[in-house]
Regions:
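Soluble, non-transmembrane catalytic domains of enzymes that act on hydrophobic metabolites at membranes
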Residues: 7-9, 98-101, 118
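A glycine-rich, Thr/Ser-enriched phosphate-binding loop motif common to dinucleotide/cofactor-binding enzymes
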Residues: 105, 123-127
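Predominantly a core beta-strand signature of beta-propeller blades
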Residues: 15, 119-121
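A structural motif shared across PLP-dependent enzymes of the aminotransferase-like
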Residues: 105-118
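A glycine-/small-residue-rich N-terminal strand-loop-strand element
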Residues: 72-105
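Short loop segments at secondary-structure junctions
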Residues: 9-10, 87-92, 116-117
């Protein structure tokens, strides 16, 4: 089973196994090679200090106002972007090939299954 990096609770990271989603006709499966977290917003969520958790932004007054507490985001996947190699194609995918290098948005995990339209094929010069 592949692994992903999650935060089960604030300030705690661990690996968890997951099952790949079934590949749909418009989707691509990718083996992740590189990934990155989003240091600003994600770090606040990881720490459990995200102001959007208990407050709502008032755009008129440009301040956060107290609201009812929203559901906790934990467990949450960590990371938000990746680069990887295409390993499988759905039957309707025509613009991507097996072994293409692609970039996309997703958590830090070993594989991703996403619509082809959500991916950017990287130029050969980036290999």
């Amino acid at each position: 089973m592949p692994l992903e990096l999650i935060a089960p609770r604030p300030r705690t990271a661990e690996f968890r196994t997951y099952a790949d989603d079934e590949l749909q006709p418009d989707q691509v499966r990718i083996r992740s090679l590189y990934g990155a977290p989003k240091h600003g917003t994600e770090l606040n969520m990881y720490r459990g200090t995200n102001p959007f958790q208990e407050k709502q932004y008032d755009s008129e007054w440009q301040v956060f106002r107290q609201t009812e507490q929203r559901p906790t985001p934990f467990p949450m996947g960590l990371g938000n972007m990746f680069v990887g190699e295409v390993t499988e194609l759905g039957s309707q995918v025509t613009n991507i090939r097996i072994s293409d290098m692609v970039a996309g948005y997703g958590n830090l995990r070993e594989t991703h299954t996403l619509p082809a339209s959500d991916l950017l094929v990287t130029p050969d010069s980036m290999a």
